[in-house]
Curated annotation (Swiss-Prot):
One of the record's GO molecular function terms: metal ion binding
Chief localisation class: cytoplasm
Key words of the record: Amino-acid biosynthesis, Aromatic amino acid biosynthesis, Cobalt, Cytoplasm, Lyase, Metal-binding, NAD, Nucleotide-binding, Zinc
Entry's cofactor comment: Binds 1 divalent metal cation per subunit. Can use either Co(2+) or Zn(2+).
UniProt gene name: aroB
Family according to the record: Belongs to the sugar phosphate cyclases superfamily. Dehydroquinate synthase family.
Pathway named in the protein's UniProt entry: Metabolic intermediate biosynthesis; chorismate biosynthesis; chorismate from D-erythrose 4-phosphate and phosphoenolpyruvate: step 2/7
GO CC annotations on file: cytoplasm
Class of this enzyme: lyase
Entry-linked InterPro entries: Dehydroquinate_synthase, DHQ_synth_AroB, DHQ_synth_fam, DHQS/DOIS_N, DHQS_C
Protein name listed in UniProt: 3-dehydroquinate synthase
Cross-referenced SUPFAM superfamilies: Dehydroquinate synthase-like (SSF56796)
Length: 354
């Protein structure tokens, strides 16, 4: 399947299919040089997939650390200096091969190298179906996740679904959080549909039917980011579960999607408190348990520490913390939430696991 952005200009294709990696070769000849920034784990399992591409004299491979460990100033400078040592021109391509962190990092390299070079996303995880589309790139700060970055559109997104076959279950769980988030944004019917399909760990682990839901997720994100590329309005909805989730992820060092799932439950609790919504918290917790999410760390959540991270969230303004909340299905808002409400919601979340 080939999708296409529909901005007024500078559009890019998104290939979502088995064997999509073959599309890379059609781009290589266009560039003076290309640098494949590949996650160390992906390189371990799939290095041979890139043998043909690396046979080109103008293509170089750079193996980078897996996951969030790569999104540091130190790794950023080291990688930039290596690329610059090859006397690159602006007609250079940075090709990101890996999960969401790899795409974030490589995209920031592309956005800042010579003030901008070509950028191709080759996501290899379920999680990256979300981050590879929409143009957000960046690295982390000691103050929080993704606080240093840019909006930078790729030249192409090449999503080869064959990469998903070897994902460990932890990465399947992490990626599914973003697929599930897109279903929540699409409403009650879409949420019921995905819950009925992926009803337990065994089905989720099999990835049976995942291709369809990944495609739906990408289409959902495309509709939103084309309407609001720079996150001034509806694009903020894509941060559902991320205000609290990023804080949990950054402090407790758990996978992104696991933390987002905790953040999704948390926002349901906040919505119930602020709007007298009737979200069934037990239902969502039991669903996560059925799928195999490890939730034991919830009892160790320390609100004061997490709150400091929440204060650094990019959605905030001078009035304080803003959260994306599902008031009711089909009625999503970005709402200021006071510290006391946030604290009570955290304490309530913990009571479900005592």
């Amino acid at each position: 399947m080939k999708l296409q952005t529909t901005y007024p200009s500078n559009n890019y294709p998104i290939y979502v299919e088995h064997g999509a990696i073959d599309h890379i070769s059609t781009y290589i000849d266009q560039f003076d040089q290309s640098f494949i920034l590949i996650d160390e784990h992906v390189n371990q399992y799939f290095a041979d997939k890139f043998d043909d591409i690396l046979s080109y004299e103008n293509v170089h491979k750079v193996i980078i650390p897996a996951g969030e460990k790569t999104k540091t100033f130190e790794q950023y400078q080291e990688t930039l200096e290596y690329i610059l040592s090859h006397h690159v021109t602006r007609n250079t391509a940075i090709i990101a091969v890996g999960g969401g962190a790899t795409g974030d990092f490589a995209g920031f390299i592309a956005a800042t190298l010579l003030r901008g070079v070509h950028f191709i996303q080759v996501p290899t995880t379920i999680l990256a179906h979300d981050s590879s589309v929409g143009g957000k790139v960046g690295i982390n700060s000691k103050q929080g996740k993704n606080l240093i970055g840019a909006f930078y559109r790729p030249t192409a997104v090449i999503y080869d679904l064959d990469f998903l076959k070897t994902l460990p279950f932890e990465q399947i769980l992490s990626g599914y959080a973003e697929v599930y988030k897109h279903a929540l944004l699409n409403g009650e019917s879409a949420t019921q549909d995905i819950e009925q399909h992926f009803k337990d760990r065994e089905i989720l682990q099999s990835l049976n039917g995942m291709d369809k839901y990944i495609a739906k997720g990408i289409e959902t994100k495309l509709d939103i980011v084309i309407a609001d590329e720079k996150e001034q309005g509806v694009r903020k909805f894509l941060n559902l579960g991320h205000t609290f989730g990023h804080a949990v992820e950054y402090y407790h060092k758990i996978p992104h999607g696991h933390a987002v799932m905790v953040g999704i439950i948390y926002q349901f609790i906040v919505a119930n408190a602020l709007f007298d919504s009737k979200h069934d918290i037990n239902h969502y917790i039991q669903y996560l348990i059925q799928l195999g999410y490890p939730l034991d760390m919830i009892t160790d959540l320390d609100f004061e520490t997490l709150y400091q991270y929440m204060l650094s969230d990019k959605k905030n303004d001078k009035q304080g913390v803003q959260m994306v909340l599902i008031r009711q299905f089909g009625d999503i808002v970005v709402q200021h939430v006071d510290q006391l409400t946030l604290q009570h919601a955290c304490e309530q979340l913990k009571t479900y696991f005592k």
